[in-house]
Amino acid sequence: SRTYGPECDYTKVPYDYTRTVMPTNKDTRPGTPSGTAEPTPPVYQLTIIGGFTDAFHFYPVIVRDSIATIYLHNNMLEYGHTYYVTIDNGVLNLADGSFQGVTKEDEWVFTTKSDMPELSDTLIVDVAGKGDFNTVQGALDFIPDFNEQQTVILVNPGDYEELVYTRNKWHVKIKGAGMADTKVHYANNEVFNPHPLTVKTNEWPGTFPSRRAAFMLDNCKDIVIEDMTIATDLKGQAEGLLINGERIALYRVHIIGSGDALQANGTIYMESCELDGGGDTILGRGSLFAYKSNFRNGGGPFSWVRNTAGNHGNVFVECTFSTEDGKQADYGRTKSNHGSAYPDAEFVLIDCKVKNIIPEGWSSIGAKTAKMYEYNTCDMVTGNPVDVSKRHPYSRQLTKDKDTELINNYRNPAFVLKGWVPDSCINGTK
């Protein structure tokens, strides 16, 4: 994992999300700095995704067995054009030496669609090219920034190996065909796409955006994602899904990450979701409400909550938390890697079931002011109430007799999510 330089700090001015035109690889050199960052070194291949000019490292060619898939720089092709493909001798090799490349005389050509689709209320993504776009990123790029019209992106069954980053999108639903049928994934992490050497990322609103997740929503509002799997294929600091936005709803989404598998900043609602990750499974300063969702990690803390005073943190109702037998997990920590604490951090479990959680519940709570609450936690295997006699002294067990109003408030998404009432089975609107 990359470390911060001695002069590295958060940007002193809010990151500028205003733009009238989305920059692309056609008109802007990948690595061109935005915000207060320095240029991204052009040591490896870079591509601009979603208008983020600092750009991303990507894999121009991915080889699996005898199949080589070539990925072009984003947004470079024109509608209604014919292109030819050449591959120099030696770029790709077969064991028997029979492949000598592709020349122009081989006439390997392809033609793009004659024109772009109309901006309608529904766009179709199909990996085989039978829709309006064959990538999720392509459909998101097509939708104007700050669009007030509701747009539905239907993602057909398929394996979408792509790095997704989108900013300034409003009122978009991204709907797959099911967790087992639609998968969006990429091999990305903090080492492959690190933060700038001189700028820290993502701690507070207005700081420099992160580039290390497989799927990133940045400065977005009123987004729904449902019925798909979103995953990173690498270990380390590697989110499957990274959210910076308001009123982001996830339904029946399987998120697979490593450390910081889900980064949640803003207001986020999850229902009937699955999350698999490593330590600090959920990271962020946002308000997250999860209902009937399952959380798994390989041991260690499930969260590193950083919400501030006046904002709720993470609340879980009728969820499960588990790790495999032979390992132990905990609800989370509030202390930073340098020993300081987030004094207003909030992590609340209501009617949840757990397996292989340490007796203390939380590994570290750095301040008595943190709201680490628990009510009616039961064992996933036996169904019996868990033994809470050794819980962390800064945590609190809620009781029906004394805390009925507070328990009921925590069962209400609007209480946690700044008054937002998402579609939800918990309140009969889903």
Predicted regions and their residues:
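Sequence-level preference for short, compositionally simple segments enriched
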Residues: S114-K130, N134-K430
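Acidic, low-complexity Ser/Thr/Gly/Pro-rich repeat segments typical of extracellular/periplasmic
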Residues: S1-P117
